[in-house]
């Protein structure tokens, strides 16, 4: 069952109840009864009417639904092991100084070049 809210008092309006008023600028207002409609046309602010939901909300006379706030999901950085290297080894490499890292990288490059040369010699045809 679809219900709407009264534009003035904010009470629920059930189907086949209430009335609609269409203003000149095509804005549609839903009212629950003629009492509310007359207050609206007299431009009486609903904050001043003690039984309206606006008044009750301002002065905390109504029990509001206490809904738990949804916690925003925060991304967490998780350290995971890489196949062939444990977490301790990775952390040790991160803690190394840049000079040590550079030297290790150059050493690895030299080893790769030597392996390529050795493979090229084996693959080279004999004369």
Swiss-Prot record:
Disulfide bonds: none annotated. Keywords: Ribonucleoprotein, Ribosomal protein. GO terms for biological process: cytoplasmic translation. Residues 93-127 are annotated as: Disordered. GO terms for molecular function: mRNA binding; structural constituent of ribosome. InterPro entries: L24e/L24_sf, Ribosomal_eL24, Ribosomal_eL24-rel_N, Ribosomal_eL24_CS. It comes from the Eukaryota. Signal peptide: none annotated. SUPFAM superfamilies: Glucocorticoid receptor-like (DNA-binding domain) (SSF57716). PROSITE patterns: RIBOSOMAL_L24E. Residues 115-127 have a biased composition (Basic residues). It holds the Pfam family Ribosomal_L24e. The keyword ATP-binding does not apply. One of its GO terms (cellular component) is cytosolic large ribosomal subunit. Belongs to the eukaryotic ribosomal protein eL24 family. PANTHER family: 60S RIBOSOMAL PROTEIN L24, RIBOSOMAL PROTEIN L24. This is Large ribosomal subunit protein eL24. It comes from Dictyostelium discoideum. The gene is rpl24.
